[in-house]
A protein has these predicted regions:
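Aromatic- and charge-enriched surface segment that lines or borders ligand/interaction sites
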Residues: 91-135, 157
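N-terminal lobe/hinge region of extracytoplasmic solute-binding protein
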Residues: 47-97, 128, 195-196
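Bacterial lipoprotein signal-peptidase II cleavage site
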Residues: 2-11
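N-terminal low-complexity, Pro/Thr/Ser-rich intrinsically disordered segments
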Residues: 20-45
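Short, solvent-exposed loop/turn elements at domain surfaces
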Residues: 52-59, 83-86, 113, 166-169, ...
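Gly/Pro-rich hinge or "lid" segments in bacterial periplasmic/extracellular proteins
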Residues: 80, 171-226
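Short, well-ordered beta-strand elements
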Residues: 41-50, 91, 101-104, 123-126, ...
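Surface-exposed binding/hinge segments that line
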Residues: 140-182, 204-206
Length: 227
């Protein structure tokens, strides 16, 4: 977890700008007993050179925005340390002989931060959001999709307009949001609350200041080491 600009707070992860980190350094005269009780070894404070411009992963943002949202949201596939495409929310996939269709088998038992289930319909709802609003970053990322169809609760097929060898690369950037949150919260709400499947949940956000996240206790993979 991470502390804010006035000290160390347990069970939270904070992304702060450099100015606030310097302020925190000056204010470290917290009582030793309190610091010990709050298990500071499990806290992480990260100083960034700029503030995140948006916390909705479908909205264009700066590099800091991507770094922050990556802790809260996940994609069907991702890159490993050697830049190979590997499974994430999807546990396996296959491509048709003509290169136009990709079928994904999804991991089961995953829930979004708002308690909603992750499934094929959730992926489709994210695509539909993108194609209905060209101002969103996800629109560009999914522009080549002709259709996305749920073959079952945990399997879907995405069909492209033409074979595209960058499709999976782009898919690593398509972060999946809870459809209920998309509908009920919109961009303004997603700037204040997170609704992804990632290891951290948005706890507090101060524009131009800091972002606090807490560990997702219901995370579907091995839990994060930092609170």
């Amino acid at each position: 977890a991470c502390g804010g600009g006035t000290g160390t707070t347990s069970n939270e992860q904070t992304t702060q700008n450099t100015e606030q980190t310097e302020q925190a350094t000056e204010e470290t005269a917290e009582p030793a007993a309190e610091a010990t009780a709050k298990s500071p070894d499990n806290d992480l404070v990260v100083a960034m050179q700029a503030d995140a411009t948006h916390l909705d992963p479908h909205v264009s943002g700066n590099g800091v925005s991507n770094t922050v949202t990556n802790a809260m949201y996940e994609s069907l596939v991702t890159f490993d340390a050697d830049t190979n495409i590997v499974p994430m929310l999807a546990k396996e996939w296959s491509m048709s002989d003509d290169g136009l269709s990709y079928t994904f088998v999804l991991n089961e038992g995953i829930t979004f931060h708002d308690g909603e289930p992750f499934n094929a319909e959730a992926v489709i709802a994210n695509w539909e959001r993108g194609r209905s609003d060209q101002s969103l970053r996800i629109y560009t990322q999914t522009q080549s999709w002709v259709s996305a169809v749920a073959d079952s609760e945990y399997q879907l097929t995405i069909t492209l307009d033409e074979p595209n060898n960058t499709f999976l690369n782009k898919l690593t950037q398509v972060r999946i949001i809870s459809p209920k949150a998309i509908e009920e919260w919109g961009q303004d709400g997603l700037a204040k609350q997170s609704a992804g499947t990632g290891p951290y949940i948005l706890s507090e956000r101060v524009d131009g200041g800091y972002t606090k996240m807490v560990r997702n206790e219901n995370y579907w993979r091995e839990g994060p080491k930092v609170d």
